[in-house]
Amino acid sequence: MAKNTYKQDEVLEEPFDIRHLLRASSYIKKYAGRMVVAILLSGIGGAFGYVAPMIIQRALDLAIPDKNEKLLFSLVGMLVGIYVVSVIFTTIRSRIMVDVSQNIIYDIRKDLFEHLQELPFQYYDDRPHGKILIRVVNYVNSVSDMLSNGLINIVLECFNLLFIVIFMFLVDVQMALVVLCGVPVLCVFMVWIKNKQRRAWQAVSNKNSNLNAYLQENIVGARITQIFAREDENAEIFKDLSQDCRRTWNTAVRYSNLVWPGIDSISVCVRAAIFLAGLVLFGQGSKSLGTIVAISSYASYFWQPIMNLGNIFNNFINNIAYLERIFETMDEPVTVKDAENAVKMPEIRGEVTFDHVNFSYDESKQILKDVSFTVKPGESVALVGPTGAGKSTIVNLISRFYNVNGGRVLIDGQDISQVTIHSLREQMGIMMQDSFIFSGDIEDNIRYGKLDATREEIVNASKTVCADEFISKMPDGYQTEVRERGSMLSQGQKQLISFARTLLSDPAILILDEATSSIDVQTEKALQTGLNAMLKGRTSFIIAHRLSTIRNCDKIMYIDNGGIMESGTHDELMAKKGYYYKLYTAQLDEVQKAG
């Protein structure tokens, strides 16, 4: 399994960095116009709403005592008008922000996916795929509302506070100061709770990621689980991971649930002080009933945006951990990329040279040590040797899926690190042992490497590699849906479709890495004619477990101990009676004993 297993938490020790939010703001800039409109609509609607207590004050102090029905009805009409305007503005603002939020999700997810497409194999080797998947889907969904509605609501609630404070001071300065006395207490409380919340929600992020990684792995490996009767053991592991999620979630929610009661407690204390002071001052005749009612209303209004800001604060703290993970992925270096002055690879003739190449996947073991060889255009080369010797590594370096640690890989005399990756790989046909089939129909899978291929070209390629026979018998022929990962196909059928896909791309260099491992011997013999057609005129590298399939190769290289131990034709190596001879005769003995 990947080095970062489902049991390992992804640790982020750095304190919250405001630069995360500043960087995230780049996704908001293109929608700034619509967001400004939304802010203005909400701001104007809110301002109208905060006039209501002053209207009520006038009704209590002027219209009702003087029995001025005309003024009273006018004030009531104003209240109704204010309500209608607020509802209209709020509805328009909501529609705008739904659109903005979905656009932000699209932009972040697109950038994240495009970056993942460019990351080298090493990145995927080191991480469970479930942990990558949760960032693209769940985390982006979580932060999108924070970046759209969250930021707008901060601005709006700050405006609301400003309007309320202004109106409070317009009504009565002394009583307004009493309302504001609770703000310092609130600031101390919010600073205390912030760090505890962030650490708690980071733990939630980690445990959810671990659970998702384990779940994804077990869904893919469900058949193996049942074959080895591992259901009970896997259920126990899943239960432990789920309990970790539950425990960290409960801890995080406990901290989050402190925010609202904390703010509410401060609010209640302040409003109680206002009420008591109002009773005393009203009794002394220094404050009117309308003033007391108005300032009490504004005191209630004052704490509402603060409570809303507390909720927004909660949401921000919850999602900052997700935002960090998203940017952590976006900042993952693309180690295999085009050089600054990379040129387009000319049409490949097929000469491949390894010039003193050294390579290791990590520092613990050197896979290739000072490897040098040259393959002429059109030559077929077989790579043989024990498991883990470096055969697949060699073909991966030719395709530039990894960078060499030392030396050079050249094609037609051109250092492949100095050409664009796209122009290199579009001229290569690479077929791995794991023949990946995408969801969709068979025709789309064969056309994958050549989107403009005609139906006739697809059928001809399939016939050449003996795939047309079984495809024609499928329920809908080439339009048959193969489901996710080609689940309705056998391994042999997947490999034949992959052969057709590779042949259709008409590569100059062909790489077959255990490409016939899942094909039965009878089909492989029938396929041999098609393979010969594929190899003709193309430089090819073949890794095969069944050595009988590579006897006719122009050159066979025995790879072991980080280098080329032997090289020559089948007859030459058999005559030497060295490494290849021992491997071939041992395999031949196994076949004879079995049959």
Q: Which ranges hold each PLM region?
A:
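Helix-loop-helix
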Residues: 64-75, 167-181, 251, 255-324, ...
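Membrane-integrated ABC transporters
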Residues: 1-49, 64-75, 93-97, 101, ...
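Hydrophobic alpha-helical transmembrane segments of ABC transporter permease domains
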Residues: 29, 40, 48, 52, ...
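Transmembrane helix-loop-helix hairpins at lipid-water interfaces of multipass membrane proteins
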Residues: 35-89, 96, 169-174, 285-289
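Juxtamembrane loop-to-helix connectors within ABC transporter transmembrane domains
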Residues: 19-20, 28, 93, 97-101, ...
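ABC-type nucleotide-binding domain
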Residues: 338-339, 345-595
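Short intracellular "coupling" helices and adjacent cytoplasmic loop segments at the cytosolic face
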Residues: 3-14, 102, 110-140, 213-237, ...
